Design a protein with these regions (language model features):
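Short Lys/Arg-enriched helix C-cap and helix-to-coil transition segments
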Residues: 11, 77-104
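Short, Lys/Arg-enriched anionic-surface-contact patches
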Residues: 16-38
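Short alpha-helical "recognition helix" segments of helix-turn-helix
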Residues: 54-59
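Short, amphipathic alpha-helical "recognition" segments used to contact nucleic acids or chromatin
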Residues: 34-51
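Helix-turn-helix DNA-binding elements, focusing on the entry/boundary residues of the two helices
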Residues: 11, 52-53
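DNA major-groove recognition helix of helix-turn-helix
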Residues: 46, 71, 78
Length: 108
């Protein structure tokens, strides 16, 4: 249950910054803004939650190789574009950071 709250916390952080909801990130939509938001969430799950590629793939409804590709893209974006380095500034999830009802609006 705590992992689920942590997942929704990071999804909410990405939604606040990009305007792309969780359902859209989990969809098959390949538009640039959706793909970048998806990759941001994948990055946070890997580096903040310490999930494996398979665990991330299951949560994001993707194949693990797609998750791996997303992490590679995020690495390149962080090196070339300053706005992507701000992902590291997102605070680590703590149980008192968020209440369960706060996550209800993020799914478009």
């Amino acid at each position: 249950m705590n992992r689920q709250r942590e997942f929704y916390y990071y999804a909410e952080q990405v939604t606040k910054r990009t305007g792309v909801g969780l359902r859209k990130m989990q969809s098959q939509d390949r538009h640039r803004e959706v793909a970048e938001a998806r990759y941001c969430l994948i990055y946070l799950m890997r580096h903040k939650m310490k999930l494996t590629l398979m665990e991330i793939a299951k949560l994001m409804r993707r194949h693990y190789s797609t998750v791996h590709h997303g992490l590679e893209v995020m690495h390149i974006l962080q090196v070339t574009m300053k706005k992507y380095t701000r992902l590291k500034e997102i605070k680590r999830y703590e149980h008192h950071n968020i209440r369960p009802r706060d996550t209800m609006y993020i799914c478009n």
